[in-house]
Design a protein with these regions (language model features):
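Positively charged, low-complexity intrinsically disordered leader regions
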Residues: 1-30
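Substrate-binding N-lobe of the ribokinase-like
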Residues: 2-4, 34, 38-106, 318
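A short, aliphatic-rich alpha-helical micro-motif
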Residues: 8, 144-145, 188-191
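Structural motif
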Residues: 14-16, 119, 148-151, 180, ...
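Conserved phosphate-binding/catalytic loop of the ribokinase/pfkB sugar-kinase fold
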Residues: 96-102, 109-144
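Short acidic, glycine-rich surface-loop motifs adjacent to enzyme active sites
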Residues: 146-159
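Conserved phosphate/ATP/ADP-binding segment of small-molecule kinases
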Residues: 158-253
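Conserved post-catalytic alpha-helical subdomain immediately downstream of the catalytic base
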Residues: 230-234, 259-322
């Protein structure tokens, strides 16, 4: 198993999707505003981190991979700051297109005493313009020819579009490399033929237009099986929050319960799950081990406040303990 984790250090992965900045304003609340019944925050600290598809890139980098990003950011100061953060992490930014028509997506969280008071979103989620789509497609195809795996990280912010999905997937599968997807509603049915499709329960309900009981294994298995059939995907990894995760591929269904954790913040857990699942598939972990490791990693990052990447050494240590026990 340790050899497979070591192989991650030689991976090259392309992440295509919606990059954004996760900003945090932390401070102290000691009074209510005289102007309206709202708390007054005395701001003490401001921080910007990489978010969205860029957080997936951070997670893959933390696992040892060389990562490239393909995305769209605004021709603005926040875009400049975001690209500087990406470059500082030694993540390839040559696939990023600058847009004159939209701002860089930024999500600002207002926090006091460890509690979220408010989130402010600055974004434009319209589809990319034709010239932007052309640039994105050209860059994505060039990078797909160089890597060992491709991730589509879709936040419905306009970066990903059907032609991009189809052409990148076709090239990747022709090269024999895995294509994994963290989908959203807009492009849900366009990810045909990908290697692994990772919706959460809400996304699967909306995508299939059905009700699902997260505690009913028969319903979940049937929904995963239908997704494989309808989209022609090779496998489905379904995240179920406190009910764990399930994976369906090759006619086989596995479920693993959520591990007991001290949850501080669930932000970014889905990014970690798709990152770990992608790396596991690219180096040769079997389906059940991929499920267990992705579930484990998603839980580990929830123990920290804010959006943070996985710590590989902690994941490896826990994986050796848990998977080692299961193999005995």
């Amino acid at each position: 198993m340790e050899n497979l984790f070591d192989k991650m250090n030689h991976l090259k992965v392309l992440v295509i999707g919606d990059v954004m900045a996760d900003a945090y304003i932390r401070g102290k609340v000691e009074r209510i505003s005289p102007e309206a019944p709202v708390p007054v925050l005395n701001s003490r600290h401001y921080e910007i981190r990489l978010g969205g598809a860029a957080n997936v890139a951070l997670n893959l980098k933390a696992l040892g991979a060389k990562v490239y990003l393909c995305s769209l950011v605004g021709q603005d100061s926040k875009g400049e700051e975001l690209i500087k953060l990406i470059d500082a992490e030694d993540i390839g930014s040559e696939g990023i297109v600058r847009s004159q028509s939209r701002p860089t997506t930024i999500k600002t969280r207002i926090i006091a005493a460890g509690q979220h008071l408010l989130r402010i979103d600055e974004e434009d989620d319209r589809p990319a313009f034709p010239d932007e789509k052309s640039s994105l497609l050209k860059k994505a195809l060039a990078l797909t020819a160089l890597v060992d795996a491709v991730v589509f990280e879709d936040y419905d912010k306009g970066v990903i579009f059907p032609e991009l999905i189809q052409e990148v997937t076709a090239l990747a599968l022709k090269r024999g490399i895995p294509v994994t997807v963290d989908p959203k509603k807009r492009n849900f049915t366009d990810y045909k033929g990908v290697t692994l499709f990772k919706p959460n329960l809400k996304e699967l309900r909306e995508g299939l237009k059905i009700e699902l009981n997260p505690k009913n294994s028969a319903e979940l298995e049937a929904a995963c099986k239908r997704t494989v059939s309808d989209l022609g995907v090779q496998g489905v990894l379904l995240t179920l929050s406190e009910n764990g995760m399930a994976i369906y591929a090759d006619g086989t269904y596995h479920h693993t319960p959520a591990m007991q954790r001290d949850i501080a913040d669930v932000s970014g857990a889905g990014d970690t799950v798709i990152s770990v699942a992608t790396a596991c598939m690219a180096v040769g972990f079997d389906l059940k081990s991929t499920l267990i490791l992705a579930n484990m990693a998603g839980g580990l990052v929830c123990e920290y406040s804010g959006v943070v990447p996985i710590q590989k050494d902690i994941l490896v240590k826990e994986a050796l303990l848990v998977l080692g026990e299961q193999s005995q």
